[in-house]
């Protein structure tokens, strides 16, 4: 019975009780979950995810995203991947998880990011004396440069010969001491400006990480100019150069940088961001670049159990994260340059082509993917990125 029919019934029979139909739920109705393809993960990752899930009891997709995001962070500066001679891309991945409060995503992130955070702290402490020495040398260099500028300026007013000072300055400028970079792997709740400046001037491989992504995507910089922030994230995913121009300060260029994205937000916030005029447009291509998950809530069934004495599978996972990060220790201001190029073996390429064509066939009118053409168009590239990361994380050599 419609609302109009009910109103008419009440008017004609004011003393008769009305039976209303089933109310529409206010919460979103999700399609039945597809089993998460945990068996497709590399054995090291699969065992760590499954073993931890038995204790933590978070939804499996949520734990897997944490493990895969840290795998992307640890491997993204080690290689690029080629689909053919012209289609070459980074191996970095973006993850976006829609989930409510209390799902224990932070706990899973803390467990699977432990090795990378420990590596970051260890390298920073080890390099601290070298960095302090370089900073002192740079201060001396700056004073010498300022002194030569003063000599040239004074000579300009007095008419003295300044050729020698100019030659000395020209030589000195090319001798600027380089300050070793200190790794900063995780940016949490960072603004667009802070992220861009660090990537341009700091450690060239990092991640944007938050279990309350609404703070980032709903920040002042995002609300003020969401298109610019999304353009930056899209460029970094593509591995392209991004130039930032400033009115009052010197601009900078982000080149040869790598970024992993791992964001979780409330489903309602994601809905608002994608629907409001000032939010993230589907046409921007940002969401399509993300691997998205909306796992069913497991709250109410997570009864306490004692943690295992040790998780050997998690130890093996952490060892691989550390080993991969060790290979990136020599990164410099130049960024992720001259990276090895991973190619698919003939068998892998054939399987990838079958997948590519199957997805493409579903994009036609009335096709399977007609409502999500933006996501489907990036699926094949995300697939080969995953394959490349599995290859790197397992320490394999040769083609994928």
PLM segments and residue spans:
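Phosphate-handling catalytic cores of nucleic-acid transaction enzymes
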Residues: 1-400
């Amino acid at each position: 019975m419609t609302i109009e029919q009910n109103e008419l019934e009440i008017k004609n029979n004011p003393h008769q009780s009305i039976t209303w139909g089933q109310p529409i739920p206010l919460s979103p109705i999700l399609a039945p979950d597809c089993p998460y393809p945990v068996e497709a993960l590399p054995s090291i990752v699969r065992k760590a995810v499954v073993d931890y899930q038995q204790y933590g009891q978070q939804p499996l997709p949520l734990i897997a995203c944490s493990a895969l995001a840290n795998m992307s962070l640890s491997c993204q500066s080690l290689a690029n991947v080629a689909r053919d001679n012209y289609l070459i891309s980074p191996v970095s991945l973006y993850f976006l998880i829609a989930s409510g409060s209390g799902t224990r995503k932070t706990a899973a992130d803390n467990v699977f990011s432990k090795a990378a955070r420990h590596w970051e702290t260890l390298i920073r402490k080890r390099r601290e004396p070298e960095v302090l020495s370089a900073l002192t040398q740079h201060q001396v260099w700056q004073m010498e440069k300022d002194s030569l500028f003063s000599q040239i300026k004074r000579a300009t007013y007095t008419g003295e010969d300044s050729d020698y000072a100019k030659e000395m300055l020209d030589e000195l400028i090319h001798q600027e001491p380089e300050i070793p970079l200190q790794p900063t792997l995780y940016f949490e709740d960072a603004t667009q400006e802070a992220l861009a400046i660090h990537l341009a001037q700091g450690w060239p491989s990092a991640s944007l990480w938050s279990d309350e992504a609404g703070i980032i995507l709903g920040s002042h910089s995002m609300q003020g100019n969401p298109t610019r922030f999304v353009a930056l994230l899209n460029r970094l995913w593509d591995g392209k150069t991004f130039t930032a121009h400033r009115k009052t300060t010197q601009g900078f260029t982000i080149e040869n940088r790598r970024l992993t994205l791992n964001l979780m937000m409330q489903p309602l916030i994601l809905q608002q961001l994608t629907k409001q005029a000032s939010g993230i447009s589907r046409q921007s291509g940002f969401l399509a670049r993300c691997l998205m998950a909306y796992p069913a809530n497991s709250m109410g069934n997570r009864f306490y159990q004692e943690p295992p004495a040790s998780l050997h599978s998690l130890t093996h996972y952490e060892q691989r994260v550390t080993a991969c990060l060790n290979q990136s220790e020599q990164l410099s201001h130049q960024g992720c340059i001259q990276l090895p190029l991973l190619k698919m073996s003939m068998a892998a390429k054939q399987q990838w082509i079958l997948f590519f064509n199957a997805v493409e066939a579903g994009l036609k009118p009335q096709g399977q993917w007609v409502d999500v053409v933006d996501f489907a168009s990036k699926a094949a590239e995300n697939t080969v990125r995953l394959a490349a990361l599995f290859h790197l994380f397992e320490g394999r050599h040769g083609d994928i």
